[in-house]
Design a protein with these regions (language model features):
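Residue-level detector of short, conserved catalytic/binding motifs and their immediate flanks
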Residues: 15, 60-63, 101, 113
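A SAM-dependent methyltransferase catalytic signature shared across enzymes that methylate proteins
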Residues: 35-41, 66-73
């Protein structure tokens, strides 16, 4: 898999790679290494894998790899004030499931470039579950399925709203 990804990265030969579905920054760095290309900056906030972190927990993260100079980078876990939304059965939705990443880069001829890397919640229904991850709803019930689909739609829309204001 790392070799396959490395081949894709080499074919792109991009100055900036915005990535999603990263569970482990070491794996991304490994794929970049297999590309044979040099990326001076690689970051996947929340998916660090080192002595104190064990990669992403619960959901994959987004990241960036670039050859350009990085002037600023920020990951946003919380929605900005005023963007919280009530989700039926879950309560107030106040956080991004996969925090978006905003990076300000300096291009080779001096222009400033802002890159937003985001991965919104899937359209897959959001069923209620207990603290251990066990379902607390009958997934075969059409009403439950409809409500779970509504939850997903609300959460996806709630995450899309503040992206316009970051």
């Amino acid at each position: 898999k790392l070799t396959w990804l490395g081949d894709r990265f080499r074919m792109l030969n991009a100055d900036v790679l915005a990535v999603q579905e990263v569970w482990d920054d070491a794996a991304l760095k490994g794929a970049l290494g297999r590309s044979g290309l040099r990326y001076d900056f690689v970051a996947v906030p929340g998916a660090e894998n080192d002595a104190t972190h064990g990669g992403a927990q619960g959901t994959p993260q987004v990241g960036i790899a670039t050859r350009l100079k990085v002037e600023a980078m920020q990951s946003f876990a919380e929605f900005p004030p005023g963007f919280q939304v009530d989700v039926p059965g879950l309560g107030l939705h106040t956080r991004f499931e996969r925090p978006p990443l905003v990076a300000t880069l300096r291009m080779k001829h001096g222009q400033s470039l802002t890159v937003l890397t985001a991965h919104l919640k899937s359209k897959r229904p959001k069923f209620l579950q207990d603290a251990q991850g066990n379902p607390t709803e009958d997934r075969d019930d059409r009403k439950v399925m409809a409500l779970a689909s509504l939850r997903s739609l609300i959460m996806r829309g709630a995450a899309a709203m503040p992206l316009r204001c970051l």
